[in-house]
Amino acid sequence: MLSSRNWVGQKVPFHASAAGKVLLAFNVAQVPSGKLEKLTNSTIINKNDLETELEKVRRAGYAVIIDELEPGLVAVSVPVVNESGLVVAALSVSGPAARLNQSRINELIKLLKNEVSKVALPNSIRTNRKKGAA
């Protein structure tokens, strides 16, 4: 049986979500000043480790989480940019780890990058940096 927490209307910590990591990596959001909440045994709670992870996200152009937000959940996210190339949002897909192996994750990264390449957001779309949670 597959189950997942209903995140609709809930605050999702940036450091534990794929979209949050994209937003942190590209300075759309700020790492919270306090302690990072541990949601699972895989959640990154050390800020130095998080910065290392965010550097990987910047270099790769996408984020992947496995078991960081909740056990058995995998998520992939890519940045969405405006006409000037400024990251203003993130596009994500998530699902159960049993269905999202590494091959499928790689496929989703390509699909997401392809979809965001079709989006032409005007420069009038900007972001207000947020701390902590989406």
Go through the PLM ranges and name each one:
Residues 24, 81, 94:
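Nucleotide phosphate-binding site architecture
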Residues 76-83:
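A short, hydrophobic, proline-anchored segment that marks a local hinge/packing element in signaling
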Residues 1-35:
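Amphipathic alpha-helical effector-binding/dimerization core
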Residues 29-76:
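C-terminal regulatory
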Residues 47-49, 53, 60, 71-72, ...:
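Juxtadomain coupling helices with adjacent low-complexity linkers
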